[in-house]
């Protein structure tokens, strides 16, 4: 693999400017004086990454060459300190964010952890926390060891047996449920065991085997009931139970020259063993191709920003003496992400309305049609970026925000229309106004002359395009301003008899009344259009909410089914290995999963309750609430 040159905060093709590229790793979680702290500068970097992340964490005993593999993934010869001396270099967890080579619009986050089992550490408990954090944060978890996967190697992996005490899936598990750790496999990362300086032949009973088969054979339980054997089996059991997907890579010794081994980052590749380089490339190729995007339960995609929140939440829990809990972390994440989802959706609405609207619109309906399209997109943005909005608190905020913004656009439209119409009417009536001031109509027959010129103004005004929603109201105000003038001209017209004047006055009053009625009908029509727009908003929110709930249900169902498949596979393997009792112990977990799957398949009543709650919030929040009651009842009725 050629070296990839990276520059700090320089955008590359396919890598948005907001996603800054790191020139070198930075400490993410510092382990100083037996205290874990999150580095604020590292959080600033994560905060700028809005892309989904693929998180690869590596752990292992100190001085086993972990950092070399991570530098290789970053496309650099050096970066993570290799720690070739007796003193281990990496303290805490170090992070390097680079563009993903094979997943467009994704960021690869590499996490290198301090070596486990360092004799200089006064508190070995921190090793356990580093191990647990690496599991919680990663989508691919790499365990690095030396020589072979034997009894000693598995004993050194005792940290995996402590995970049940260091991690919680749920904040308040029910007493009748299986152990909390039974759910680990639903959200734990893929497990990759890398074995360095491997000298054995990959054979079993004289037959060639793959690296993966070598790992699975090493994880088989040892028969026997004495405590020593049971302790030896614990890491094997935990790895098989907790990690659904497992992979193994073995590496030859990179070189036999000890001097080179101490300075691997400075050794030209031609001086390293060719087979070792091929094995390293295979490992990197697998990561780039198969390492998954980091997700939380129910398919919540983790971005760089979200990863930063998770780090802080987990480390805060550890420092407070509590146990990091996935459910609590997701809740904390939702409280930060959901307001941002509301803002993002509202901004999208404003931007699209501003781009698509040409004020003044010819009719109110034209504006409402654009509003409906922009609102639909904004709701989709909110649904995509929000989660765990269980009380619909943030959905209500979005409804409120968009309604206010819509009201602002309606007001701007009215103001633009009124301003334009007044200017046009003033221009068209200039000659009429001048004639009145000069007394042109104060002559016998002047009333007819006045009416003709006024009618011409009205006709010319009618021909003005795109006057907008205030066209009639502005005209009506203008005509109203002419009533006294017309009455004065009429009374002073000596060419008309008293009877003709009375008829003319009555005709003027009738025309004015008709104009008033026309204006009233127009306002009623607009009110009806606004009400219909509210109904469309209600229908759109409810439809997208229903779609999101259905997607969440399907995600949960797939999650349960994958976990059930994994449990059944473990149970089958236990039976094959003649561990009947351990196989039977899985029955409770398997039966509970089957019940959850059936319950999830038939969740219509629960979904209807959620939709009913959302419907009630929508009805109260949207203007014209009482008129929407029937719409809500009809919508829910159609879903029963």
UniProtKB/Swiss-Prot annotation:
EC number(s) given by UniProt: 3.6.5.-
Domain of life assignment: Eukaryota
Keyword terms of this UniProt record: Coiled coil, Cytoplasm, Golgi apparatus, GTP-binding, Hydrolase, Immunity, Innate immunity, Membrane, Nucleotide-binding, Nucleus, Ubl conjugation
Protein modification: (Microbial infection) Ubiquitinated by S.flexneri IpaH9.8, leading to its degradation by the proteasome, thereby preventing its ability to promote host defense against bacterial infection.
Catalytic activity: GTP + H2O = GDP + phosphate + H(+)
GO biological process: cellular response to type II interferon; defense response to Gram-positive bacterium; defense response to protozoan
Entry-linked Pfam families: GBP, GBP_C
Region (GTPase domain (Globular)): 1-325
Cited function: Interferon (IFN)-inducible GTPase that plays important roles in innate immunity against a diverse range of bacterial, viral and protozoan pathogens. Negatively regulates the antiviral response by inhibiting activation of IRF7 transcription factor.
Protein name: Guanylate-binding protein 4
UniProt organism field: Homo sapiens
């Amino acid at each position: 693999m050629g070296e990839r040159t990276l520059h700090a905060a320089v955008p590359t093709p396919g890598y948005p400017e907001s996603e800054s590229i790191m020139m070198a790793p930075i400490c993410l979680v510092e382990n100083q004086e037996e205290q874990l702290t999150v580095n604020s500068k590292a959080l600033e970097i994560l905060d700028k990454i809005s892309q989904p992340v693929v998180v690869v964490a590596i752990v292992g005993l100190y001085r086993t060459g972990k950092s070399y593999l991570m530098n290789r993934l970053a496309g650099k010869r050096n970066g993570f300190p290799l720690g070739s001396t007796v003193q281990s270099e990496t303290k805490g967890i170090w992070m390097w964010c680079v563009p993903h080579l094979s997943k467009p619009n994704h960021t690869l986050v590499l996490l290198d952890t301090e070596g486990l089992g360092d004799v200089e550490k006064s508190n070995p408990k921190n090793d356990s926390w580093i191990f647990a954090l690496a599991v919680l944060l990663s989508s691919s978890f790499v365990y690095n060891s030396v020589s072979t996967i034997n009894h000693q190697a598995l004993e050194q992996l005792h940290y995996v047996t402590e995970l049940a005490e260091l991690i919680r899936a749920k904040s308040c598990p029910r007493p009748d449920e299986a152990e909390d750790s039974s759910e680990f496999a639903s959200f734990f990362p893929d497990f990759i065991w890398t074995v360095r300086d491997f000298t054995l032949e990959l054979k079993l009973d004289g037959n060639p085997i793959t690296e993966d088969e070598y790992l699975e054979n090493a994880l088989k339980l040892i028969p026997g009931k004495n405590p020593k054997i049971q302790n030896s089996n614990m890491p094997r059991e935990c790895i098989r139970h907790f990690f659904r997907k497992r992979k193994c890579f073995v590496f030859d010794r990179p070189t036999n020259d000890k001097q080179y081994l101490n300075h691997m980052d400075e050794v030209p590749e031609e001086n390293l063993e060719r087979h070792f380089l091929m094995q390293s490339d295979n490992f990197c190729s697998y990561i780039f191709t198969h390492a998954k995007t980091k997700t939380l339960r129910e398919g919540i995609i983790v971005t760089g920003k979200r990863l930063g929140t998770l780090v802080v939440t987990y480390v805060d829990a550890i420092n407070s003496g509590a146990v990091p809990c996935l459910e609590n972390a997701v809740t904390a994440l939702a409280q930060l992400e959901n307001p941002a989802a509301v803002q993002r959706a509202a901004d999208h609405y404003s931007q699209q309305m501003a781009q698509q609207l040409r004020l003044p619109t010819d009719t109110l309906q034209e504006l409402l049609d654009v509003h409906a399209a922009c609102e639909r997109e904004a709701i989709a943005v909110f649904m995509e970026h929000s989660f765990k909005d269980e009380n619909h608190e943030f959905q209500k905020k979005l409804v409120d925000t968009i309604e206010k913004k819509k009201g602002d656009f309606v007001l701007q439209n009215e103001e633009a229309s009124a301003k334009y119409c007044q200017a046009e009417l003033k221009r068209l009536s200039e000659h009429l106004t001048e004639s009145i001031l000069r007394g042109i109509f104060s002559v016998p027959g002047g009333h007819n002359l006045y009416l003709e010129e006024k009618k011409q103004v009205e006709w010319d005004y009618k021909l003005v395009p795109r006057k907008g929603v205030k066209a009639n109201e502005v005209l009506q105000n203008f005509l109203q301003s002419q009533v006294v003038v017309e009455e004065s001209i009429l009374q002073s017209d000596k060419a008309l008899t008293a009877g003709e004047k009375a008829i003319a006055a009555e005709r003027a009053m009738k025309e004015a009344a008709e104009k008033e009625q026309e204006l009233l009908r127009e306002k009623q029509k607009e009110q009806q259009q606004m009400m219909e727009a509210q109904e469309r908003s209600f229908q759109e929110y409810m439809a997208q909410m229903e779609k999101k709930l259905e997607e969440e249900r399907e995600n949960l169902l797939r999650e349960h089914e994958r976990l059930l498949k994994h449990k059944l596979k473990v149970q089958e393997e236990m039976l094959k290995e003649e561990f009947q009792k351990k196989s039977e112990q899985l029955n409770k977990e398997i039966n509970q999963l089957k019940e959850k799957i059936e319950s999830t398949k038939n969740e219509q009543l629960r979904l209807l309750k959620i939709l009913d709650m959302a419907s009630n919030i929508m009805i109260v929040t949207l203007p014209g609430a009482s008129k929407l009651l029937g719409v809500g009842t009809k919508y829910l009725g159609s879903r029963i």
